A protein has these predicted regions:
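Bacterial N-terminal signal peptides that target proteins for export
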Residues: 1-8
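Bacterial Sec-dependent N-terminal signal peptides
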Residues: 3, 13-44, 157-163
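A generic signature of intrinsically disordered, low-complexity regions enriched in glycine/proline
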Residues: 10, 28-29, 50, 149
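First exposed extracellular module after export/assembly in secreted or surface-exposed proteins
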Residues: 38-163
Length: 163
């Protein structure tokens, strides 16, 4: 009889425990913030200093996690002042790439409402054969500003390395 009471108590406790759980569809919940970030490789180190290579072009891709609710205006630019941060983070001794060796034809982009990305930002490198082969150069390109959304700080900048 005691065993019967214990089984009945256990069954009642189990029923209360199981029925007390909330039935929510966790797939409908967002467990992240919708922030803008650079989705291309953070460090592009395939740019070589060679007499035969005078020009190169690279692109920065960016995106947000969920479709935009409204248009997002984004501005990019080179940030040579971030060279020291690059050297500290990646334990390097690179020099900032001089402005005469690159151009960014279009420094703004727009992610339209309902989209998660837009056209890539193009960086044109020129006269790279004039760089000193004994040095490493870095060009940090960063998101300066974005309207209607926050920028993910850890993925705000892309670094282009010449070696």
């Amino acid at each position: 009889m005691k065993l019967y009471k214990y089984c009945l108590a256990f069954l009642a406790l189990t029923t209360v425990t199981v029925s007390g759980c909330k039935n929510e569809d966790i797939n409908e919940e967002h467990h992240y913030d919708n922030k803008l970030y650079v989705s291309s490789t953070p460090v592009c180190d395939d740019l070589l200093i060679k007499p035969s290579i005078t020009e190169a072009t690279r692109e920065i891709s960016y995106r947000i996690a969920s479709p935009a609710e409204q248009d997002i205006q984004i501005s990019f630019d080179a940030a040579p002042a971030m060279t020291a941060a690059y050297n500290l983070i990646y334990n390097d001794n690179a020099t900032a790439l001089d402005a005469r060796f690159y151009s960014i034809p279009n420094k703004t982009a727009t992610i339209k409402a309902g989209d998660v990305s837009s056209d890539n930002i193009v960086i044109d490198f020129k006269n790279t054969n004039e760089l000193d082969k004994s040095k490493r150069y870095v060009l940090p390109v960063t998101i300066l500003d974005a309207s209607n959304i926050e920028v993910l700080e850890s993925a705000r900048t892309a670094y282009f390395i010449f070696k």
